[in-house]
Amino acid sequence: MKQTILTFITKVNPAKVSDLKALLEGMAKDVEGNAVIPFPKLKLLHFASLVVNEAPDYDPCLVFENNFDGPLDPYLEELYLHASEGLHQIYSCCPDYPVASAPDKAQLLSYLRAHVVHPNAYHIGNVGRSAERTHQEDALRDSLEDFLDGVVAQGNIGPLASIRQKVQAFVKSQPLFTWAAKVEPRQTASEHFMPRLNLVIAGLIALLLSPLLIPLLLVWVIMLRWTETHEAPPADLSIDTNVKNLVKREDFPHIVQNHMCHISIVKPGAFRRGTLRGVLRLINLIARTSDKGELSGIPSIHFAHWSLIDNGRRLLFVSNFDGSWENYLDDFIDKASSGLTGIWSNTVDYPKTRFLILDGSRDGSRFKAAARAKQTYTNVWYSAYKQLTVQTIDNNSSIREDLFTSLDDSATRDWLLRF
């Protein structure tokens, strides 16, 4: 199952920013029950957010993030079916939206397609698991755990193989779980193999062209160091009152996930913009091979992406992740500092770096201050499975995938320990 990450980014009429914010604030009060965009009816959807961004020197804009199953067209059809009136109401606040008293399907979908922004780099934590499969496997695990609790309570435990046979018989007896026996791979062979082949090909091309690339690389390093030593120093940022506003959309009760939207200004000049595009391309190449639930050792990212917007003048970063903001940033600093610094060292007010990837985020307090300063208030955020972590989803899939496979006693013990 292919998953798609994208945003619809539109300008907002300055005179209607307050109206749009009020509309979104009403949605946020009951995200799952709101009538504007009834998110639970969108069965292809994993995560979504709406952010109104106001920044000096830029028109106010609306960032509508979508992470969903399959290609764009079926998702747009589903979105129109369940949310046409609400989308019409939202985008009526945008100056280039076709004015009409009621939504016109062709115009609305054409408008959304015209404002699609695809990511320059992205990561998916649970590759190949559709939203439907995620819900199904979680329900299966809960049911099997209850069944096993009953077996233990009856004192009828027996050998491990016997317990597993009872579990299999239970699943076969439940009409609700007829789907469980037919396991589709998380990825096809080509989906798993091609990103690795692309990485190898890129390495071979670099090796073959090394006589040409090495002199160019030396020139680039000299230009980089000159740029780093002559740029204006980053502002001395501190965690300001903006944090009080940001945390209103963090650490909700009974939700194990969080959301972050971060918009930075790219440092001026073709050199910095070109370097950032190259870094994002490399990050994306590596991220395509990170299909085991982790990105650079970080096991908490559901969907995340970077997009260059406003003709490359700003960098958008959006992430749906497990745990707190503080722990998430600490994970990045501890486990992915080089990649993190390689990207954001090309943006304004990031902690000072050397050779693109040194220092930077390793100055943890300054990095966190910069991250907060560039973070945008999330007006609306929706998760289709807000109580599941990346690791829980992977564990649920492993339970289902090994349910009817042949296992020895050691593997059976490991399988039962997953509950």
Model regions: which residues?
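Short S/T/G/P-rich N-terminal loop/turn motif that feeds into the first structured element of a domain
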Residues: M1-H46, D59, N67-L72, Q107-H302, ...
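An exposed acidic His-Trp-rich patch
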Residues: P74-G128, F321-T376
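Elongated alpha-helical scaffolds
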Residues: F39-L81, E85-I90, P299-A304, L308-S319, ...
